[in-house]
């Protein structure tokens, strides 16, 4: 039994399939099956039960895998402690579509001559459920999840079940983004005022659920969203607070809705046992600085 084999076991548990784990690990299935059998014989327990859809851990197997994951995490901890390289820039993060987060990413790239270093960057935008799964699966080291404050317990249950560490970043109300040519620019805005406007929807955030009573377009590309806001005055978007610099660059106006306030919250997440690298810490610092600016 060695460390690498323990890591193989945790992959089998994650994918609930020997064949899928073998594909992910780039080894053949018979070899992986043999390793599992050897470990089961050495530990004198049955770790997995086979069935027609894959494998599931036995009761003893869950206990064994729990300890195996702790060992894997401790080894990863040691590796991360000495992995920082002043000549390399490593960052791996999954986030919601949000201008303040992308602004923090840009500020991070600009600090300490980061762009002169060898780059290994993975910045992915997606929804909260996919972010949780990506971080749990090890596809991303860091994640930012966003959800309504009223759903906090539901998401905490998922995060705890997947043994992810979470830290609150920011609580806010969604605001209305319009161009300076929008007729609502100088008015107090109420929900009824939006009925004659076109909502540009993006991501998995749904502020207005009455789809049949208001005009909307689903737009998932950030560049065209901003173009539409500028070119078609009677359009708007629900957005998280945005940096003033970005508003000024695009001639946008950010307005509050007087009769629609739904608090949302952003959380930073990562796997338990994962040690934040120097690059991770620098990005989080940039993130918190931008949050202070948009509050």
Predicted regions and their residues:
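Secondary-structure junction motif
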Residues: 101-107, 152, 184-216, 277
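Hydrophobic hinge/microswitch elements
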Residues: 136-140, 204-255
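A late-sequence structural motif
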Residues: 255-295
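Short beta-strand-centered segments that line the small-molecule binding cleft or hinge
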Residues: 107-111, 128-174, 253-254
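A short LG(V/I)-centered, amphipathic sequence patch enriched
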Residues: 40-57
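Short helix-boundary/capping micro-motifs
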Residues: 10-28
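N-terminal winged-helix
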Residues: 30, 85-133
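Flexible hinge/capping segments at coil-to-helix
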Residues: 158-199
